[in-house]
């Protein structure tokens, strides 16, 4: 494998200048998603987008199945008598709920699920009898509905979240449930690592935790415009839902005890984050393990005579790659120029392009181009499979490295409100000393003009032995609080 063109990646000026305009352009031109459906916050997945989505769903399913989770499918309707049982939960969701107020000639009042804790617990009560039935680990990938009143964004802020993976687990005690919380965090790290995403792990402040949770752990990434995007959450629910739904089990000593539960969710926001994080002014780069097409073969010919020489060689290269397990497409269209095809597949984020021209056939080689760097390599035909394997690994590693470096460069630690405001204006995530007092934290948000993401769980959270003061209320600081503008 010989380098024949140095790396010269596309710029990101258009992407950075107006991120949402760029994202709409990408979804439209790459035929991933159509935003023209005439219901606010409800959009259409196009065939290429569905291929990306199915690969992400397969990753999610694999990692849940491998860790003892079992897939289920619950109805979209939740009876109001179930939904209204947990008071904190209904207070948190009531303004976002779609109500089914009429069905045919009447009928009971129903809720379109915003999340499924109140749908699943009544059934768990029927399934769990004694401690031998626990732990119970369930998940489903479904649509959930939120009556968003804010501005909606494709994949990011929706009224129908159509790829909502929600896991619900039931345990004998807090210790076992919190062990599950830690495992859920590890599952999400593996998912986001395969998506080549950089992320922060934050314990949400009490005023921003999931409605009905004892505590919430969130995964946040930062988009190129400096705004944070929540891409996953894990909740320890304690006995809040099992108390109201009377989910108990028979313990070994013969007593009946309340079960403890957790839930954790991820949605198409993660796909939005992936497309944007790896995007540039020519389109996006889809991480190799998730790309519908990992290698596109572009035959380069002029006239029927060259076509007769080049096409068989292109098909032979594709055959060898498919037999090695790669997802390959040959773009043999003769009504499009090679340059047009290069643009088309770069827009769609295919990680590698194999170019086959007449001279390449004569020299028993091909040219392989990386989408992430645009570097090109001359590769002997009999070395193509090994070269593609190595280059796909390099593309994946480079995407992950770039994302991590960019996120690290955005997180700054400051001690004053003025410094925090200045950093937020520059698109940074700030860490400020915090006393842990909720009133002080809410005031910090107001003073800085940003949202609290929470206390870091991926780095040292304690202020240690430093005599730092909470800038909102003057109390002695105990931990660092992350703040950022966010979607």
From Swiss-Prot:
Gene Ontology cellular component list: aminoacyl-tRNA synthetase multienzyme complex; cytoplasm
Database matches in CDD domains: ProRS_anticodon_zinc
One GO BP: prolyl-tRNA aminoacylation
Keywords on record: Aminoacyl-tRNA synthetase, ATP-binding, Cytoplasm, Ligase, Nucleotide-binding, Protein biosynthesis
Chemical reaction(s) catalysed: tRNA(Pro) + L-proline + ATP = L-prolyl-tRNA(Pro) + AMP + diphosphate
Main location: cytoplasm
EC number: 6.1.1.15
InterPro entries in the record: aa-tRNA-synt_IIb (IPR002314), aa-tRNA-synth_II (IPR006195), aa-tRNA-synth_II/BPL/LPL (IPR045864), Anticodon-bd (IPR004154), Anticodon-bd_dom_sf (IPR036621), Pro-tRNA-ligase_IIa (IPR002316), Pro-tRNA-ligase_IIa_arc-type (IPR004499), Pro-tRNA_ligase_II_C (IPR016061)
Location(s) in or outside the cell: Cytoplasm
MF-aspect GO terms: ATP binding; proline-tRNA ligase activity
Pfam families: HGTP_anticodon, ProRS-C_1, tRNA-synt_2b
Cited function: Catalyzes the attachment of proline to tRNA(Pro) in a two-step reaction: proline is first activated by ATP to form Pro-AMP and then transferred to the acceptor end of tRNA(Pro).
Family: Belongs to the class-II aminoacyl-tRNA synthetase family. ProS type 3 subfamily.
Domain notes: Consists of three domains: the N-terminal catalytic domain, the anticodon-binding domain and the C-terminal extension.
Subunit and interaction comment: Homodimer.
NCBIfam families documented for this protein: proS_fam_I
Protein name, UniProt field: Proline--tRNA ligase
Organism per entry: Pyrobaculum calidifontis (strain DSM 21063 / JCM 11548 / VA1)
């Amino acid at each position: 494998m010989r380098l024949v063109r140095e790396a010269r990646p596309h710029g990101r000026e258009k992407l950075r200048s107006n991120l949402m305009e760029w994202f709409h352009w990408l979804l439209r031109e790459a035929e991933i998603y159509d935003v023209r459906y005439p219901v606010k916050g409800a959009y259409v997945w196009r065939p290429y987008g569905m291929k990306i989505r199915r690969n992400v769903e397969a990753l999610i399913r694999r990692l849940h199945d491998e860790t003892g989770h079992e897939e289920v499918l619950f109805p979209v309707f939740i009876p109001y008598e179930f939904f209204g049982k947990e008071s904190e939960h209904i207070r948190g969701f009531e303004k976002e709920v779609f109500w089914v107020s009429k069905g045919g000639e009447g009928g009971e009042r129903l809720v379109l699920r915003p999340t499924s804790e109140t749908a699943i617990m009544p059934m768990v009560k029927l399934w769990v009898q004694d401690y031998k039935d626990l732990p119970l680990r369930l998940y489903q990938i479904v649509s959930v509905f939120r009556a968003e009143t804010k501005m909606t964004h494709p994949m990011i802020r929706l009224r129908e979240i159509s790829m909502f993976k929600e896991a619900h687990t039931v345990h004998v005690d807090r210790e076992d449930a919190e062990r599950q919380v830690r495992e859920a965090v590890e599952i999400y790290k593996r998912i986001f690592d395969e998506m080549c995403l950089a992320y922060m792990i934050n314990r949400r402040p009490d005023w921003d935790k999931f409605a009905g949770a004892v505590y919430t752990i969130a995964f946040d990434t930062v988009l190129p415009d400096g705004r944070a995007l929540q891409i996953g959450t894990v909740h320890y629910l304690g006995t809040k839902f099992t108390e109201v739904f009377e989910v108990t089990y028979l313990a070994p000593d013969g007593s009946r005890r309340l079960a403890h539960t957790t839930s954790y969710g991820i949605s198409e926001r993660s796909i939005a984050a992936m497309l944007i994080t790896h995007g540039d002014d020519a389109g996006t780069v889809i991480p190799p393990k998730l790309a519908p097409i990992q290698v596109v073969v572009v035959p380069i010919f002029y006239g029927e005579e060259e076509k007769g020489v080049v096409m068989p060689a292109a098909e032979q290269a594709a055959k060898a790659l498919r037999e090695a397990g790669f997802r390959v497409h040959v773009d043999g269209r003769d009504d499009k120029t090679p340059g047009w095809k290069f643009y088309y597949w770069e827009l769609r984020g295919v990680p590698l392009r194999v170019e086959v021209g007449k001279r390449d056939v004569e020299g028993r080689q091909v040219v392989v181009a990386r989408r992430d760097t645009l570097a090109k390599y001359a590769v002997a035909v009999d070395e193509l499979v090994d070269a593609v394997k190595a280059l796909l690994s390099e593309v994946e590693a480079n995407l992950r490295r770039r994302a991590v470096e960019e996120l690290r460069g955005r997180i700054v630690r400051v001690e004053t409100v003025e410094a925090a405001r200045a950093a937020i204006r520059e698109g940074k995530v700030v860490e400020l000393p915090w006393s842990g007092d909720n009133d002080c934290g809410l005031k910090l948000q107001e003073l800085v003009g940003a949202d609290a993401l929470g206390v870091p769980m991926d780095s040292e959270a304690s202020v240690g032995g430093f005599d730092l003061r909470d800038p909102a209320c003057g109390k002695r600081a105990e931990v660092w609080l992350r703040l950022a503008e966010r979607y």
